[in-house]
Amino acid sequence: MATLRVDEINKILRERIEQYNRKVGIENIGRVVQVGDGIARIIGLGEIMSGELVEFAEGTRGIALNLESKNVGIVLMGDGLMIQEGSFVKATGRIAQIPVSEAYLGRVINALAKPIDGRGEIVASESRLIESPAPGIISRRSVYEPLQTGLIAIDSMIPIGRGQRELIIGDRQTGKTAVATDTILNQKGQDVICVYVAIGQRASSVAQVVTTFHEEGAMEYTIVVAEMADSPATLQYLAPYTGAALAEYFMYRERHTLIIYDDLSKQAQAYRQMSLLLRRPPGREAYPGDVFYLHSRLLERAAKLNSLLGEGSMTALPIVETQSGDVSAYIPTNVISITDGQIFLSADLFNAGIRPAINVGISVSRVGSAAQIKAMKQVAGKSKLELAQFAELQAFAQFASALDKTSQNQLARGRRLRELLKQSQSNPLPVEEQVATIYTGTRGYLDSLEIEQVKKFLDELRKHLKDTKPQFQEIISSSKTFTEQAETLLKEAIQEQLERFSLQEQT
């Protein structure tokens, strides 16, 4: 029989007592009473904040949205299939936040700022709250710098400035995403950081956009935040705020940023789904009462900061989808009232082959010519009025049997102006080439050409101008003004091209 050695037992006990570290902590714990459809009901979380992150025993995270007298309504950031009734839930004491850094440029991430492009983890030392207050009135200054989209129709007649919020609205399949992605492509070399937020879209559509960015070299200055159609409603609801937090990080570091929300209709639908499951009272179109606040607190974060804060900017281009052109629906009217203007895309124009299918007559920018360079103001000042008059005259001409010579000339000019506004996708034009194009149309140089020849003529003119008159681009880019010298150079180039073009047509 083995003898007990008291001294050894004594030694072991002493070592264990010395190593014992007593930790006393208070944790806010609750229990799951109901779970399903991305929602969990919890009892026992007595001191929880609205919007606080909670952690379930099996690792899923959630956000506390409904604080009721008997229970707390949690929206889950995952499928929650392993959460069981009666399991423990711990409040973290933190509001949702994401890591931020320059390393996010060129990456595709989800609403929790986790990479989903298979290129490894992203190193970040700083973090920002997903929802942070918008800059106040004193922190801002008025919008005065242009943000060039590369699309003639927008830059000449519906100009967008850095720090503006311009809504892109239209039916499905009218080219809304194309307008937004072309704007991102045009920021190459402009020192603008772009954030593209895809909400509730097909994975194939997002992959196509990312591929375009890679091919055109735009991913170097772009971050893509994507939550697909199969993502939980909570993550689709959070994605725009994640994108805004990343854009704000660069804005407060004295940089210019552009953020695209594609599209806010899907975010509103995700929020409606969450609210109805949380048993919040439905309002118009079954949306909850605070759906306006959902979008206003997001879009108000776009701003042009004053000189004390570094003059950084965040330009927002939210996209909203309409049903059969109905802009008087709840979400479209809400977002129209929040933004500084809207670009309407028309299905009729799209089907008629006018692309981008921008209805210039009812599109508006509330910043106006403050967001244009002087050269553009000089050449494009009356083009919107001319196009509006053309549309009116065209409608009248359908019923009139005979038109006078002036009206016929106006119709001919209008058709050519409409033709020069057409642009192929992923082909944004620099502002110098836009100025030359608009001048050619508004001064009547295209009147002698057939409508089918306009596109070919303008393409050749822009190439001829670049090759033989490089001083023109230098004058516009340096002085931002359409000087007499620039006009002389452009007139020479147009005359030379008209002669060359007529010879080509004859042969």
From Swiss-Prot:
Keywords: ATP synthesis, ATP-binding, CF(1), Chloroplast, Hydrogen ion transport, Ion transport, Membrane, Nucleotide-binding, Plastid, Thylakoid, Translocase, Transport. It is found in: Plastid, Chloroplast thylakoid membrane. One of its GO terms (cellular component) is chloroplast thylakoid membrane. One of its GO terms (molecular function) is ADP binding. It catalyses: ATP + H2O + 4 H(+)(in) = ADP + phosphate + 5 H(+)(out). Disulfide bonds: none annotated. InterPro entries: ATP_synth_asu-like_sf, ATP_synth_asu_C, ATP_synth_asu_C_sf, ATP_synth_F1_a_nt-bd_dom, ATP_synth_F1_asu, ATPase_a/bsu_AS, ATPase_F1/V1/A1_a/bsu_N, ATPase_F1/V1/A1_a/bsu_N_sf. Its EC number is 7.1.2.2. Pfam families: ATP-synt_ab, ATP-synt_ab_C, ATP-synt_ab_N. The keyword Signal does not apply. ATP binds at G170, D171, R172, Q173, T174, G175, K176, T177. Its main location: plastid. It is a peripheral membrane protein. The record marks S363 as: Required for activity. One of its GO terms (biological process) is proton motive force-driven ATP synthesis. Produces ATP from ADP in the presence of a proton gradient across the membrane. The alpha chain is a regulatory subunit. Belongs to the ATPase alpha/beta chains family. F-type ATPases have 2 components, CF(1) - the catalytic core - and CF(0) - the membrane proton channel. CF(1) has five subunits: alpha(3), beta(3), gamma(1), delta(1), epsilon(1). CF(0) has four main subunits: a, b, b' and c. This is ATP synthase subunit alpha, chloroplastic. It comes from Sorghum bicolor. The lineage of its organism: Eukaryota, Viridiplantae, Streptophyta, Embryophyta, Tracheophyta.
